[in-house]
């Protein structure tokens, strides 16, 4: 009898202990991101189609371009990385867009830095994850990992960098995405198959002759990358890497056709990027340009594509970068406030979510690249290289990208300025060796918008050969009625 009674008491005690531990674990889970749980629940049924999205990301680093674990190019920016800059940035975003969830990417050196300002800053970033639901992730190689490091080394950096992020945040945290600038297919494959990460900002659309690397030739909206080249959309199941490739910054489609920076007053990266758009021209012109570029996606682009996306990375150093770089005494934060306020006024239903969340929404909608058919139309904003008389139409899909440029002053027909074919074989450069970086990873074939090669001259669409016309006709028959 005593044995039976003891068994009953023991069983009940075990049940009570189980309930207690489950309750404790549940409370811990609620505590982790308890402020974000309410926000996340509101977007539980969020779909890609029918919505406008804004992804806002920032980078925490020590040096301007950390090309590898222990080598850097450019200026030491540690003096403008502190609690003050981080609070200024995050509070401005929350004020301008209440409920926004943003993505923080930390460099290798920032993760390793044990100085008080970096330790305090990292704790603050973790608190934003818990309070707002922000994503925290890793950035390898200062946007240019493959230009300076072997693919194997980049994989190792990704593995250990992501591990450091998980340890920093704690409680089994894992980001949904990575910020990388440019990233080779081998590293995108590694992220998907070995790290379980299926979203990467792995291309900078139209970047050429800017900073430390070139990667011109991709489409500007999300796609599954090919195993041949990160700029190329996968052509079939065997070619597909299950890591969505995202652009980092939308740019003005008209200024994007130029090469480099500082061509007079023309900056090819003008659009929403902080340096070329706000810090150089100033707040008045800069915010006008940012709103015009945003409208090309949130108005016309939304009507054409049934969803819209504006991507933006603002490095944390820029909050007080004027202390290092001058920037005519500007920090751009007033421009950010105006831009965010105007976005909220004009498109109140737009969603500001993390890069990882947006990528996963896209991934749930598209299982491959077969149905991709992105169309964009933009007229010049009148600011610098975005001439008011110019207009451009872009068509982007799995097979090719096509750009048609028009001039309302005297030009009788649109000109083809870009026809990049993705049905052709593509090949990336080999790994860098001997301490010599490999800068140019662009994908250029038939005709490229930058005009850097002798063959890159604008042509009438009827000057394409019969095979090229047939390729375009398969997607857009309206363009070949004249042929």
Which functions belong to the PLM regions below?
Residues 199-219, 269-398, 402:
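C-terminal domain-boundary segment and adjacent tail
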Residues 33-126, 306-319, 340, 390-398, ...:
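Active-site beta->alpha N-cap acidic-glycine motif
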Residues 406-482:
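Acidic-aromatic substrate-binding/catalytic surfaces of carbohydrate-active enzymes
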Residues 73-91, 116-125, 152-162, 283-300, ...:
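Well-ordered, non-membrane alpha-helical segments in soluble/globular domains
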Residues 2-13:
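Bacterial N-terminal signal peptides that target proteins for export
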Residues 36-41, 177-304, 379-384:
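Active-site-adjacent pocket scaffolds in enzyme catalytic domains
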Residues 100, 105-182, 242-273, 305-323, ...:
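Metal-dependent polysaccharide deacetylase catalytic core of the NodB/CE4 family, i.e.
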């Amino acid at each position: 009898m005593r044995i039976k009674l003891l068994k009953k008491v023991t069983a009940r005690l075990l049940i009570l202990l189980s309930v207690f531990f489950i309750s404790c674990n549940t409370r811990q889970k609620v505590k982790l991101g308890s402020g974000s749980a309410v926000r996340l629940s509101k977007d539980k049924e969020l779909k890609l189609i029918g919505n406008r999205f804004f992804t806002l990301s920032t980078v925490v680093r020590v040096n301007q371009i950390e090309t590898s674990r222990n080598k850097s190019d450019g200026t030491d920016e540690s003096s403008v990385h502190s609690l003050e800059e981080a609070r200024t940035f995050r509070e401005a975003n929350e004020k301008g867009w209440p409920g926004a969830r943003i993505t923080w990417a930390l460099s290798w050196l920032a993760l390793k830095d044990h100085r008080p300002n970096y330790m305090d800053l990292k704790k603050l970033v973790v608190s934003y994850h818990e309070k707002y639901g922000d994503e925290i992730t890793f950035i390898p190689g200062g946007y240019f990992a493959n230009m300076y490091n072997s693919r194997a080394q980049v994989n190792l950096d990704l593995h250990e960098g992501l591990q450091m992020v998980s340890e920093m945040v704690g409680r089994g945290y894992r980001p949904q995405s990575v910020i990388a600038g440019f990233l080779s297919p081998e590293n995108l494959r590694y992220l998907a198959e070995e790290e379980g990460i299926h979203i990467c900002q792995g291309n900078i659309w139209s970047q050429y002759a800017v900073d430390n690397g070139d990667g011109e030739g991709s489409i500007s909206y999300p796609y599954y990358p090919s195993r041949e080249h990160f700029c190329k959309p996968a052509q079939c199941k065997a070619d597909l890497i299950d890591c969505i490739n995202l652009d980092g910054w939308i740019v003005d489609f008209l200024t994007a056709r130029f090469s480099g920076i500082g061509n007079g007053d023309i900056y090819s990266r003008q659009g929403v990027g902080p340096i070329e758009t706000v810090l150089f021209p100033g707040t008045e012109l800069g915010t006008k340009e940012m709103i015009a570029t945003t409208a090309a996606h949130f108005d016309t682009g939304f009507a054409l594509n049934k969803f819209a996306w504006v991507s933006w990375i603002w490095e944390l150093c820029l909050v007080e970068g004027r202390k290092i770089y001058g920037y005519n005494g500007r920090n751009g934060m007033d421009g950010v406030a105006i831009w965010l306020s105007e976005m909220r006024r004009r498109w109140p239903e737009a969603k500001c979510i993390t890069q990882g969340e947006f990528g996963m929404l896209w991934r749930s909608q598209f299982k491959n690249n077969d149905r991709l058919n992105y169309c964009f139309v933009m007229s010049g904003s009148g600011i610098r290289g975005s001439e008011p008389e110019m207009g451009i139409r872009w068509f982007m899909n799995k097979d090719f990208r096509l750009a048609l440029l028009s001039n309302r002053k005297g030009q009788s027909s649109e000109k083809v300025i870009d026809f990049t074919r993705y049905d052709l074989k593509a090949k990336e450069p080999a790994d860098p060796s001997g301490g010599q970086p490999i800068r140019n990873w662009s994908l250029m074939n038939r005709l490229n918008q930058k005009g850097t090669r002798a063959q890159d001259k604008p042509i009438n669409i009827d000057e394409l050969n019969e095979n090229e016309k047939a390729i375009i006709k398969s997607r857009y028959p309206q363009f070949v009625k004249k042929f």
